Amino acid sequence: MGKTRDLSEKIKDTKGTSHAKMGSIKDRNGMDLTEAEDIKKKWQEYTEELYKKHLHNPDNHDGVITDLEPDILECEVKWALESITTNKASGGDGIPVELFQILKDDAVKVLHSICQQIWKTYQWPQDWKRSVFIPMPKKGNAKECSNYCTIALISHASKVMLKILQARLQQYVNHELPYVQAGFRKGRGTRDQIANIRWIMEKAREFLKNIYFCFIDYAKAFDCVDHNKLWKILKEMGIPDHLTCLLRNLYASQEATVRTGHGTTDWFQIGKGVCQGCILSPCLFNLYAEDIMRNAGLEEAQAGIKIAGRNINNLRYADDTTLMAESEEELKSLLMKVKEESEKVGLKLNIQKMKIMASGPITSWEIDGETVSDFIFWGSKITADGDCSHEIKRRLLLGRKVMTNLDSIFKSRDITLPTKVRLVKAMVFPVVMYGCESWTVKKAEHRRIDAFELWCWRRLLRVP
C-alpha cells in the first residue's frame, strides 16, 4: 500500500499536478476579501450561521433509558482500530492513527477502558466532540462560501468508538431501509443505481410506456439535519434508547473550527447537521431521509413504474433522490409530497439544480426545475431515449484525456514498460469502463472500444 501511495505521489510530481489554493472569497455585499484575517472571519460567520441551532426547537429528552445494550468487548475495540484507514489527516488532537496501531494491545486496553466508560456514563470526552472543517470546492463560483462542502476531520481515537457504535446500529438500519436506497450500504454502490435506471428505461421502452424523471437536489442536506427531529425518528424506527442517548450526547455541545490556507478560525458551537467525514453521518442521514419518504407515502403511492408486479417510483443514494412516474401529473404529485415532508424536517430542495427529464411528450409542464434531454446520473450520462452510445462516447473521450495527461510518464525512460502497462490498466481503463455493466453495446460501439484500446497501446509504445 505504501509503495502504491509513493508511486501516486511521483506520478503527480512528474505530471506537475497541483491543487489550486483557495484565493479570495466574497463578503455579504459581494466584495472580494483578500486579507487572511478577513477570510477567516468570513468563514467563521458563514459556518456559525450554517450550523446554528433553531431556538424554537428545544430538546425534550426525558433521560429515561429502558434497555441497556451489551458492554463493549476488547475484541470490538481491536477490530475497530485495525479497520481505520491509515494515511488520513488527524483531527484537532493531531494524533495519527498509526500511533495507536503501533502500540497494538496497549492502545486497545486504554481505548477499551475509555469506550466502556462512555458506554456506561453516556458522556463523551470534549476532544472527541471537536471537528476541524476543511472547505472543499464544488461546482460554481469558488469565491462563494456556499459553493464549498465542509469535510470534518475528527480524532482518530474517537473513530474507534464511532465504528463500534455504527456496527451496533447497522442491524437496525438495514432492517429499516428499503431496496431503493443504495447509499453507503454494504454490497451496494452507484453502479447499481445506474444499472437500475437504465433497466427501468429499457423496460418502459419495451412496453411502449412514457417515463418522467425528476432528479432532486437538496441544498446543504447533511448540514441541515435537525438533531431533535433525528432523535425522534430514531425512536420511531426502533433504535434502542441506549444507542440514541449516546448519539444525543455526542451531538450535544459539539464544537468545530474551519481550517483553510489562510489559517484556522476560532472554535464555535454546532447546533444542527451531521458532519461529512464522520463515520456515523451516512447511516443517520439515511434514516432521516427514509422518514421523509415514508411520510410522503411513496411506498403506498400508485404513481410510478410497474415492473414485475412491483411499483417503483424512486431511486436513492443517500441524499440524491430520483423520482419517476408514467405521467406528468403523477410526477408532480410525488414531488409535491416529498417537498412538503422535506421542509417539515428542515431540508429544502435546490430548485436551481433540480432537473426534469422525460421520454414522452410534455404537454403542460408545471414542475419547478430545468427540463433536460440528458443528465449525469452518478457519473454516468443518462439520455431521455435510453441510448447508451452517448455515454460510451463520453467515457472514451474521458479515457483519451487521462491517457494524454500521462504522456510525460510514457515518455520517461526511467519508468519500465511493465509499470507503464500497469498504469494504463489502473488509471485509464477504469475511467472508460465505469458503469459498463449496464451498457447495451452495439457493433459500432464495440469497434470504437477496440479501437480505443489499440490506440492506448500504440500511444504507450510511441508507435505512430
Model-derived features: positions:
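Short, conserved micro-motifs composed of acidic
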Residues: H262, K348-S373
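Active-site-proximal segment of RNA-dependent polymerases
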Residues: L55-K78, Q123, W128-V132, Q171-C224, ...
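Conserved catalytic palm subdomain of right-hand nucleotidyl-transferase polymerases, strongest
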Residues: S24, N87-I95, F133, K143-L153, ...
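Conserved polymerase palm-domain catalytic core
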Residues: Y218-A318, E326-S333, Q352-I356
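Conserved pre-motif C helix in the palm subdomain of viral-like polymerases
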Residues: V108, S146-L177, A195, A219-F222, ...
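Basic, alpha-helical interaction scaffolds
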Residues: G369-W439
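Surface-exposed loop/turn segments and immediately adjacent short secondary-structure elements
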Residues: G2-S146, A152, H156-V160, I376, ...
